[in-house]
Design a protein with these regions (language model features):
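Collagen/collagen-like triple-helix recognition
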Residues: 20-47
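His/Cys-centered metal/cofactor-coordination and adjacent catalytic loops
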Residues: 154-169
Length: 543
């Protein structure tokens, strides 16, 4: 292109940008008002919407230019690490679209709260002994700065999984332990069992992630002095202990002779009631088991709060919201309450928050619940962003690993993300008929590379495990694929869908956030937290 044509092209673009107005949501024109020189905004054809892409790009560049990174060591008073368990990039994309569609928009233009954070990188998730990782090894990397083996909780790769005798000298110090030693307040929140792999790695050390209660310990572990994960939470003796613990997993904290408020028995064989011990070992302590007692919790007069809201994992957020399961707080509510308790400490705090059930829904092949739990995580991050300042709080959002969850086909703009694929015709007009495979059968936009496969259930996501894996394709013409009970088809039939090995995103803001850049090893996350809050030096000085 010669200089004259280039000038004319730029003039045309800039002139076009000055004419017309964009659609109501500023991106797609499908619900827009007519532009001065545009069409009526139907089918995404409003030329003013095209102009808005250019304007939005300019605005984004201007915003990025105005950022002044704070890379001073120790500048972060507080750290909040959010982990979407199993929240790969395809899950983020699909949840973004679903949230937008639930708001009445086409969806693609939507952004989850954490997608607005200014700094972004990718993390390589493999474990020392695994190309595709598990949550124990990945979370250990994030909270200790050291990669380890599959199934191992905050211990180095020198251990043999499941062997207590191999653990001597292998414990790794976690960011939560460093914070407590430095005098900061600490908290762990999860919608999974609080003794499950991801939250456990913040405070416990074990060669086997499944040692959640003492009844899970093999004889060798007992003989060699290993403790179960729940007991380690109570025995956490750094600083003033953990200040806030909220999630599921009550059964690991109460004796097997005790029945909890849900009518379910505990799992402890040693007779210890760790909930009672929590109340006795801390002053200004509280223990809550349902949403009512949680909401009544007085944060001003509570320094140590233990909330165990389910015998096992907490409910999926879809079920909590739509199916009358009202006895549990949301992830956003737990996050807000935790911050209110922790920020009373003038030295600052470290809080780790996990959306644990994204992973579980994917394992069951139930995309709807996985995406709703991702949206719930977005709401929790939004609350944290509102309650903290980017000037003194490093806030990061990431995943421990991905899943074999795909977004496929050529669906038209705004096609229901959980629906059957409907494409555009040769003229770019959306078709009224479903796209079909080589055998003439319709297919969904989202699906899985492996797993249990198709099922259309009226019950919860985990009920899929009561049925055998479905091999091959099924005719979906008369199936409501947008129902929360629909379980997507899978290419390779397995008893459970697997994790995936691709990189996961890291979103960040606040002091040290600009150190999240490029593609990094997952253990880099710890080192950013340590640099931003100067945890090691503060902990060392406090001893």
């Amino acid at each position: 292109m010669n200089k004259k044509l280039l000038v004319l092209s730029l003039a045309a673009i800039l002139g076009l940008a000055a004419c017309g107005s964009d659609g109501d949501n500023g991106t797609d024109g499908s619900a827009g008002t007519p532009g001065a020189d545009g069409t009526d905004g139907q089918n995404g054809k409003d030329w003013s919407a095209v102009n808005q892409w250019f304007i939005d790009g300019q605005n984004r560049v201007a915003t990025a230019q105005s950022l002044t990174p704070n890379n001073q060591a120790g500048a972060a008073k507080n750290i909040i690490l959010f982990v979407g368990d199993g929240m790969g990039v395809s899950t983020v994309t699909a949840a973004r679209i679903l949230e937008g569609q639930l708001k009445g928009h086409t969806g693609e233009e939507n952004s989850l709260s954490f997608e607005t954070l200014p700094h972004l990188g990718l993390a390589k998730t493999y474990n020392v002994d695994g190309q595709t990782p598990d949550s124990a090894g990945t979370m250990t990397a994030m909270v200790t700065g050291v990669k380890t083996d599959v199934g191992v909780i905050s211990q180095a790769e020198g251990v043999t999984r499941g062997n207590c005798a191999s653990t001597s000298g292998q414990n790794l110090v976690t960011s939560l332990e460093l914070a407590a030693m430095a005098g900061l307040s600490t908290g762990v929140v999860s919608t999974a069992r609080i003794t499950h792999a991801t939250p456990a790695a913040a405070y416990a050390h074990a060669p086997e992630r499944n040692w959640e209660a003492d009844s899970n310990l093999p004889a060798e572990a007992v003989t060699n002095g290993c403790k179960d994960i729940a007991a380690q939470l109570l025995d956490f003796n750094q600083g003033k202990g953990i200040n806030v613990v909220m999630g599921g997993g009550r059964r690991a904290f109460i004796p097997n002779t005790t029945v909890d408020p849900e009518g379910k028995s505990g799992r402890r064989a040693d007779g210890r009631d760790l909930t009672a011990e929590w109340l006795s070992q801390y002053s200004n302590a509280a223990y809550v088991t349902d949403r009512d007692s949680f909401l009544a919790l007085d944060t001003a007069n509570t320094d140590h709060a233990l909330g165990l809201f389910n015998s096992s994992h907490m409910e999926y957020d879809y079920d909590r919201v739509t199916s009358g399961v009202k006895g549990e707080p949301s992830l956003a509510e737990m996050t807000a309450k935790s911050i209110d308790i922790l920020r009373k400490n003038n030295k600052g705090f470290v809080l780790i928050v996990e959306a644990g059930r994204i992973d579980h829904a994917h394992h069951a092949g139930n995309a709807a619940r996985a995406l709703h739990d991702t949206i719930a995580l977005s709401e929790a991050v939004r609350v944290a962003m509102e309650k903290t300042s980017a000037s003194d709080t490093l806030l990061m959002v990431t995943a421990d690993h991905s899943h074999v969850f795909t977004i496929a086909g050529y669906p038209t703009r705004g096609n229901p993300i959980l629906g059957l694929v409907k494409s555009n015709d040769a003229n770019g007009v959306p078709t009224v008929t479903n796209s079909t495979d080589a055998n003439g059968m319709p297919y969904t936009t989202v699906g899985y590379a492996n797993g249990l496969g198709f099922a259309s259930l009226e019950t919860g996501g985990d009920e899929r495990y009561n049925y055998v894996a479905t091999a091959g394709r099924v005719d979906l013409n008369y199936t409501d694929t947008q129902s929360a009970g629909f379980h997507q088809e899978a290419l390779v039939p397995l008893g459970s869908e697997t994790h995936a090995g691709e990189d996961v995103a890291i979103f960040a803001r606040g002091p040290g956030a600009s150190l999240i850049q490029g593609t990094v090893e997952q253990n880099h996350i710890f080192h950013v937290m340590n640099y931003a809050a100067d945890l090691v030096n503060k902990a060392t000085a406090a001893q």
